Every structure is written in structure tokens, then in C-alpha cells.
A protein has these predicted regions:
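Short, glycine/acidic-enriched loop or turn micro-motifs at the edges of active sites
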Residues: 14, 24, 50, 73, ...
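Short catalytic-loop micro-motif centered on adjacent basic/acidic residues
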Residues: 18-20, 42-44, 116-118
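Active-site HxH/HxHxD metal-binding segment of metal-dependent hydrolases
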Residues: 25-113, 132-153, 161, 170, ...
Length: 247
């Protein structure tokens, strides 16, 4: 009904995958995973609105893969029943979530890693995921934790250092190795083609979402592909030039 974009990102060599925003149609997701012989290493939600987490518990039960959200959205997830009532739909199954990501963490599967960028505004715990191919900092597990950053380091400076590949030696939270081609940004409901996420729902903030986009997402190269939570793909360059909310 709500037509959320669910992303399945697989490594064709290792057959490992990450699933982002399983809002519904879990059987269809499982069918695609079986068709491509993919093993889910992690399930990530960019935020916990019901259209992005409606299938979370069922997919976790079927795959046993760890579920990751930003802790600032946990309270919103705990009120799925109220979200469902507001939309006039059934309450989906829920689960206990105890594993959280934060700014600078990297979720890994196969030869790929997704850098967590905290982009509050649509919700307090909204995140975007910068996906690149490269060797991550450790050989075991699915999550590299970010090293604590100096208090004065700006988010933009940290992102630019990461993109240059000089964010330090192989430390938790870094993605090492050259990227192959432009990065891919799974943006959730923060940035859309020609628009931005709603800020009139619980926890929303127009100031925060504009800061998230301008200070963090627009620090990425123009050729970065943006996969939004709804609608068509776009690029950072296209939104920098054409998005009316960013002028």
C-alpha cells in the first residue's frame, strides 16, 4: 500500500547480501534471495516508520540475520501499533531490537561495506548508507564500529577524508581499498528525486533534515547514485542542481 523501496544488495562472488528497509512482501524478498542464492548477513532499516519496518520481524525470523537500526528511532519502533492505527492498517509483527548503528559504523557483507551516515530530520534516528566495494577493516563479523572522533571534527571533513581513503589506518568504521566506480547512497526518506522527506510527523524537523542533506549528503561526489525510500533513483549532482528544497 505504501510502496517503500526495499534494497537487496548482494555480492555476486561471495553470495552475501544486505537487505535494507523490508517494509512488506517478505515472501517476495525471500524468493529473490533464493533465486540469486544470497545469504543475508544483515538487515538494516534507514528509519522505523511502519512502511520501512513492516516486514522486519518476519525477515529476521526467516533468515536469522541481525537487525540494525539507529537507537534514536527505537521509541518509534516500539509504537508500531500507533503507527498502524494512524494509517488504518494492521499492526505488523515486531521484535526486540538490541543492536544499533551510529555515525561512522560500517555494515559489511562479502566484499562490500555500507558506511552509516546519521541523517536526522525525517525521524530522529534516520540514517543513510553509503555503499562501496572495497576491503573492510576486519575479516570477521558484519559490523565495524567507528572509532570515536575528536569533538571538533566536522561531519563533512570526516566524510571527505573517508571518500579520499585517508581516514586513518584500518580502524573500526573505515572502509579500505579503492571504490570501483561511483558510490551508491541508500537514502531512506531523507532525500528524494526533486524533494526531501516529510518533517510533519513525530520527531521530524525541517531544520535537521536540511542540515543533514547540506552538511553530509551534499559532501558526496555529484556522480553518487541515490536510492531513495520511495520513487525513482537520482544522483547527488542532480539534486544539488535541481532540488527546490536545496536552493
Amino acid at each position: 500500500m505504501l510502496q517503500c523501496n526495499c534494497s537487496i544488495l548482494g555480492d555476486p562472488e561471495t553470495r552475501d547480501a544486505m537487505v535494507v528497509d523490508p517494509g512488506d512482501e517478505v515472501e517476495r524478498i525471500l524468493e529473490i534471495l533464493r533465486e540469486h542464492r544470497l545469504n543475508v548477513r544483515a538487515i538494516v532499516s534507514t528509519h522505523t516508520h511502519i512502511d520501512h519496518v513492516g516486514g522486519l520481524a518476519l525477515l529476521h525470523a526467516a533468515t536469522k540475520a541481525p537487525v540494525l537500526i539507529h537507537e534514536a528511532d527505537l521509541e518509534l519502533y516500539r509504537h508500531l501499533d500507533m503507527q498502524a492505527q494512524f494509517l488504518g492498517m494492521r499492526t505488523p509483527e515486531s521484535m526486540r531490537i538490541e543492536d544499533f548503528v551510529k555515525e561512522g559504523d560500517s555494515v559489511r557483507w562479502g566484499g562490500y561495506a555500507a558506511r552509516v551516515i546519521h541523517t536526522p530530520g525525517h525521524t530522529p534516528g534516520s540514517i543513510s548508507l553509503l555503499v562501496e566495494k572495497g576491503q573492510s577493516s576486519s575479516k570477521q563479523g558484519y559490523l565495524d564500529r567507528a572509532r570515536p572522533e575528536p569533538a571538533k571534527a566536522s561531519a563533512e571533513a570526516h566524510l571527505q577524508a573517508h571518500l579520499r581513503g585517508d581516514a586513518g589506518d584500518a580502524v573500526p568504521g573505515s572502509v579500505r581499498g579503492a571504490a570501483t566506480g561511483p558510490g551508491r547512497l541508500v537514502a531512506g526518506d531523507t532525500l528524494f528525486q526533486g524533494s526531501i522527506g516529510r518533517t510533519d510527523l513525530w520527531g521530524g524537523s525541517m531544520k535537521d533534515i536540511l542540515n543533514s542533506i547540506r552538511e553530509k549528503l551534499l559532501a558526496l561526489p555529484d556522480e553518487t547514485l541515490v536510492v531513495p525510500g520511495h520513487g525513482e533513483n537520482t544522483t547527488i549532482g542532480e539534486e544539488r542542481a535541481e532540488n527546490p528544497y536545496l536552493r
